[in-house]
Amino acid sequence: LNKKFHFAVFLPQYENLEYWKSQIAGIEKAAIEFSKFGIVLDYFFYDFNISSFKESVKKVLEFDCDALLFAPIFYEESVRFLSEYEKKNTPIVMIDSNISNNDQHAYVGQDAFQSGYLAGRLISFAVKNERQILIFKITREIESTSVYLQRIDGFYSFFKDHEELQNFKFSEVTIKDSGIDQLNLEMFSGINSVFVPNSRAYIVARFLEQNNIKGVRIIGYDLLKENIEYLNKGVIDFLINQRPEEQGYMGINHLYKKLVLQETVANTHYIPLEIILKENYFPARKS
């Protein structure tokens, strides 16, 4: 009865990143709940750079455990790591993004394509006249991740599927980091709506506010403090919430069901996408 189950948790460092902090909070919540069943978590963190990721990969591959919870950020390195890890024949759950075609692995998280498709609908909603849409990519190298690209793909697909929406014209801007000094007024000349396919919508919002540009519809992701600030001010219109805490919790829950209860569990668990507007954002009260 007193068997211990060791789960390796392999994630990016989270100190100042709310999204990953929330993932960890969900994982911790599950850890506490399931500790009485002998579940022990061993954490492996990597910094947001490839060399740190590779260092941690070595440790994770050497570590003996019953299952792995993994958030793949660097696409190619993660694919390589997975194919190496598969030789261990232990269950693997991915959270945040799904990079594997292997049906044996589980995935808990958003359907990235679908979330981009949803953003397309939100942009087109209740709009009749000619619209200029800007897809604003604020990306560090790591975000050539599949999630990012799938969201953009989903976004364009919405308009492909709705050919009657002839009044939308698209342009793209890419900046390399989140410095507001990279933005200029010309980027937004004539623009009616902006889609930011990651959690940095607040950078666009801050720029528009500073330059007193009003009436631009902004859609982004994730309930970061800064995003919420501009949502409440009415500068950001919609945020798509991926419920990171639930992802972390469900990832551990999946392994608990599979290994401890030995239940058959579905390998894909999509977290429902939440559309957050100023009017329906009620922060969770810390009890």
Predicted regions and their residues:
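Hydrophobic alpha-helical segments within soluble ligand-binding/sensing domains
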Residues: 107-133, 181, 243-260
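Conserved beta-strand elements of the Class I
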Residues: 8, 132-136, 192
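Hinge/beta->alpha junction and helix N-cap segments in small-molecule ligand-binding domains
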Residues: 12-21, 42-52, 109-115, 136-154, ...
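Signal peptide-proximal N-terminal region
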Residues: 28-40
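Flexible loop/hinge segments that line or gate small-molecule binding clefts
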Residues: 77-114, 224-232
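Hinge/cleft segment of the Venus flytrap/periplasmic-binding protein
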Residues: 140-144, 159, 243-287
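N-terminal helix-turn-helix/winged-helix DNA-binding helices
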Residues: 1-17
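Hydrophobic alpha-helical
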Residues: 67-86, 171-226
